[in-house]
Design a protein with these regions (language model features):
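Serine-esterase "nucleophile elbow" of acetyl-processing enzymes
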Residues: 1-47, 65, 93-98
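Short, solvent-exposed beta-strand-terminating loops
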Residues: 7-8, 81-96, 147-154, 198-205
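Serine-dependent acyl-ester chemistry module
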Residues: 89-118, 150-175
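Catalytic His-Asp segment of secreted/periplasmic serine-dependent ester chemistry enzymes
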Residues: 149-246
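Structural recognition of the beta-strand scaffold that forms the well-ordered cores
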Residues: 1-2, 6, 40-45, 73-78, ...
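A structural motif corresponding to the C-terminal end of an alpha-helix
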Residues: 32-40, 125-144, 177-195
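Short, well-structured alpha-helical segments in soluble
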Residues: 55-71
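A substrate-binding/cap region within the structured catalytic cores of diverse enzymes
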Residues: 71-111, 119-120, 126-133
């Protein structure tokens, strides 16, 4: 369950039972691991999901936690980025950056400010509540939090990430806080964690061996969803999750 970093938008093919806004790939990490370990999978991940969509509905889409039962034995969770405006902020800043660089007008979204401390604190509380509710509904399940792959290099930027220094550093700060929150929630609730944020360093959108799509440019279109894992990135997460479970 979780957001687009669990669902895999832009990675073919889409799961036939996917509601329109969710874009669940048959090659997302949950599907890959379920196939390798011969597990029965219920995939409720959904692009654009926030923590509120795990506990409550998203339009006609039921709460993701409703997929749990006492018989559930494994729950994977990637969530939190949308609560912080993480990828949305990166996209808006990149649109503005490319417009400034090229002089070509673009229909950019308004800039998203760095999350306030209260926003980070509220996310930590909501993620903790989710972990506890998973435990209540599925007491025998192994809970695994999977955090977000690195989008940007540890310093600087590149043509695939047209960001000024302020925007790039702000995104890195948000990513670091999200990883820290995820780790603490997992530790506090006896859950396991796959630290994609760590092992994906060096495979960011600027890397020659990128696991992450960058921002599309006229001369360099993106084959997939911008600032989201590509097929290699999703497989790397699946490999790490499989290693944890074996």
């Amino acid at each position: 369950m979780g957001s687009s970093f669990a669902a895999g938008p832009g990675i073919p093919d889409y799961y036939e039972a996917t509601p329109a806004p969710c874009y669940r790939s048959t090659q997302n990490y949950a599907h890959q691991v379920a196939a390798r370990l011969e597990l029965a999978l219920t995939d409720v991940s959904c692009s654009g999901a926030t923590t509120a969509h795990l506990t409550g509905p998203r339009g006609s889409i039921p709460p993701q936690l409703d997929a749990l039962s006492p018989d559930t034995r494994l729950v994977t969770i990637t969530i939190g980025g949308n609560d912080l405006g993480y990828i949305g902020g990166l996209t808006a800043a990149s649109c503005a950056g490319l417009q400034k660089e090229t002089g070509v007008e673009a229909n950019c979204s308004p800039p998203i400010t760095l999350p306030a401390e209260l926003t980070f604190n509220n996310l930590a509380l909501r993620m903790d509540e989710i972990a506890k509710e998973v435990r209540r509904r599925s007491p025998e399940a192994q809970i695994v939090f999977v955090d977000y792959l690195a989008v940007l290099p540890e310093t600087g930027a590149c043509s695939a990430t047209p960001l000024d220094e302020f925007a790039a550093d702000g995104a890195r700060y948000t990513a670091r806080r999200l990883a820290e929150i995820t780790r603490k929630v997992a530790d506090d609730n006896g859950a396991s964690i796959v630290t994609a944020s760590e092992f994906s360093k060096g495979h960011d959108a600027c890397s020659t061996e990128a696991w992450m799509n960058g921002y599309p440019r006229p001369e360099a279109p993106v084959n997939g969803a911008m600032y989201h894992p590509n097929a290699a990135g999703m497989t790397a997460v699946a490999d790490a999750l499989e290693q944890l479970l074996r």
